Amino acid sequence: MATVTAALVKELRERTGAGMMECKKALVEANADIELAIENMRKSGAAKAAKKAGNVAAEGAIIIKEENGSAVLLEVNCQTDFVAKDGNFTAFAQEVAAAALASKATVEELQAQFEEARVALVAKIGENINIRRVQYVEGTAIASYRHGEKIGVVVAGEGDAETLKHVAMHVAASKPEYVNPEDVPADVVAKEKEVQVEIAMNEGKPAEIAEKMVVGRMKKFTGEISLTGQAFIMEPKKTVGEMLKEKGASVATFVRLEVGEGIEKAEGLSFAEEVALAQKG
């Protein structure tokens, strides 16, 4: 039987990123054949990744990349904030984002393209990893802003870089849903109007006064959920629309992504319990 040397273990660790004991075990089982050990580890890594696939991945990072009037926002998820800061995880996310910007691939295409790398990463770090969302923005003038790793915004429009950057920061903080009040869909407006009419009637106001109240409340509602109607966070006495007009700027579109939006975590588990389960997995 061939001897498993420390040098072989070291080489296998460098090539796979796996732990020392895992590398030694793989070499023993492969009779010190490093290529066979790597093949076997890849196979067992795939099995490990499959076991991790059911674990909720609601942490992670938003990556933004820009080039020549194009930008990509990518969300890659993991299970814990600790792994979200891991160099291997961030390198993987950056690689996927770079490929996305170059190809404008769909999330399904990116998932297929990077599945082998994802499986290897799951085996290495021991957490479920998921390429979840990708969105693209095109424009003559683009600005982006990331709040830590968790929130990413890209704004496209007309104007100087500083103004659009400030708008991106505003979007990160204030979460507008539409660019302008008139962009709010008719069904959303109608649903809110029903609510406001009922509230006014329940307050016992005369019909004429109730109607005026509803008009005012609806104007406030559409303003609060649209970018240009919101109070600008850096100058709250002005709306974003007023600030843009003063600067001779405009916004055509924006995209805001936040890590874990819409993902339901398992109920009844504390963070420590989730980590313990991940370690057992």
Swiss-Prot record:
InterPro entries: EF-Ts_dimer_sf, Transl_elong_EFTs/EF1B, Transl_elong_EFTs/EF1B_dimer, Transl_elong_Ts_CS, UBA-like_sf. Residues 80-83 are annotated as: Involved in Mg(2+) ion dislocation from EF-Tu. The keyword Oxidoreductase does not apply. One of its GO terms (molecular function) is translation elongation factor activity. It is found in: Cytoplasm. Keywords: Cytoplasm, Elongation factor, Protein biosynthesis. PROSITE patterns: EF_TS_1, EF_TS_2. The keyword Membrane does not apply. GO terms for cellular component: cytoplasm. It holds the Pfam family EF_TS. Associates with the EF-Tu.GDP complex and induces the exchange of GDP to GTP. It remains bound to the aminoacyl-tRNA.EF-Tu.GTP complex up to the GTP hydrolysis stage on the ribosome. Belongs to the EF-Ts family. PANTHER family: ELONGATION FACTOR TS, ELONGATION FACTOR TS, MITOCHONDRIAL. This is Elongation factor Ts. It comes from Vibrio parahaemolyticus serotype O3:K6 (strain RIMD 2210633). The gene is tsf.
